[in-house]
Design a protein with these regions (language model features):
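Intrinsic structural disorder/low-complexity segments
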Residues: 11-12, 90
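Short stretches within intrinsically disordered, low-complexity N-terminal or propeptide regions
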Residues: 9, 16-18, 29
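Beta-rich carbohydrate-recognition and catalytic domains
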Residues: 24-114, 122-231, 240-297, 307-331
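N-terminal secretory signal peptides that target proteins for export/translocation
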Residues: 1-9
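Compositionally biased, intrinsically disordered low-complexity segments enriched
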Residues: 10-11, 79
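Bacterial N-terminal signal peptides
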Residues: 14-24
């Protein structure tokens, strides 16, 4: 094969954003809904400020579009290590105006001292469903709250208790709810901790979005020893629905706890069935503020907005800042 033909094939590969996966039967092509990720800003779009509730860190945001604006709920941390959720909104997705006070602060015993962490958002009808981690400095547990305006929240409590799972015998965190029913049920990918102290991804289902049951006896997306996701496999934002399946952005950490971003595709009719998984990360720490902060070498994607021609992803940098990444839609 000539060098010219090889270059042409590589160009077509890059343009179509097609990933080839070798199987025992044949090569199956999976098409991702987006192209190459590019930082929308080389600097943080949200940073810690003041001496109070958001003075140590503002990071790991969830986002939705409401009344023509991008609304962000972000994790804010004070110098004592207590987390709350702040509210900010934007017309362009980059420049945000914050509310002066948090919209969700620790109240229950399961949130005391540690706080409310790492939000994810999904909307059904006129109700917003917020999954978050309740942390009381001893236990981290996956919790739920609902709202009609993203400001006033009704807590539903712990939805997946720690230490009581099928395979996840430790903490539970990071609930990414699929934005449509499948087989008459709601589905949610989550993080659980196995007896060997590794964090892996599980799946749960619900009839009402409040009461959840684990769907499997083993992780649906396990860690991979020796790779970039050898230690942590954690859901990102709400999955993207495509003809290929459920496209799930996830955050993986290696044995040195360097966090990078990757992609998995699950069957749209059977969300337990993994179809594709990144061999390499699609996004990694590069900027100084992604490498130096409260936790070094972290990019952690939790928010996503579909802007029509592209996607805008939001992430935490080094557990201190918020950044944004643009990715064109695949054609």
């Amino acid at each position: 094969m000539s060098d010219r033909n090889t270059a042409q094939q590589r160009s077509l590969f890059a343009t179509a954003f097609v990933i080839l996966i070798s199987t025992s039967v044949a090569a199956v092509a999976w098409k991702l809904p987006f192209g190459t990720w590019h930082r929308a800003s080389e600097t943080p779009i949200l940073s810690p400020q003041g001496n109070g509730w958001e003075s140590a860190g503002t990071f790991n945001p969830a986002v939705v579009v409401r009344e023509g604006k991008i609304v962000m709920l972000y994790r804010a941390q004070d110098t004592q290590g207590t987390s709350r959720l702040g509210y900010a909104e934007s017309t362009d997705g980059i420049h945000f105006t914050r509310r002066p006070e948090p919209v969700l602060s620790p109240e229950g015993d399961y949130e005391k001292d540690g706080g409310v962490e790492d939000p994810r958002l999904v909307q059904f009808g006129d109700t917003y469903y917020l999954t978050y981690t309740g942390y009381n400095t001893k236990d981290a547990q996956l919790c739920l709250a609902t709202s009609h305006d993203l400001i006033h929240w009704d807590r539903k409590g712990v939805i997946l208790p720690a230490y009581k799972g099928n395979w996840n015998t430790g903490w539970t965190k990071s609930g990414a709810i699929v934005p449509e029913k499948i087989d008459g049920r709601y589905w949610m990918y989550f993080l659980g901790t196995t007896p060997d102290k590794n964090d892996q991804m599980g799946l749960a289902y619900s009839a009402d979005l409040v009461h959840w049951t684990e769907a499997t006896k083993t992780p649906v997306l396990p860690r991979r020893p020796g790779q970039f996701d050898s230690r942590v496999v954690e859901p990102g934002p709400t999955p993207i629905l495509t003809s290929e399946g459920l496209v799930l952005i996830y955050n993986g950490a290696d044995d040195k706890l360097v966090y990078r971003t990757a992609v998995a595709i699950f069957d749209r009719k059977d969300p337990t069935k993994l179809l594709y998984r990144s061999e390499q990360p699609i996004f990694a720490p590069q900027q100084e503020w992604e490498k130096v902060g409260q936790v070094p070498n972290v990019v952690f994607v939790e928010g996503m907005v579909d802007r029509g021609n592209d996607y805008l992803f939001y992430y935490g940098g080094a557990d201190k800042y918020v950044g944004a990444v643009e990715a064109p839609k695949a054609r």
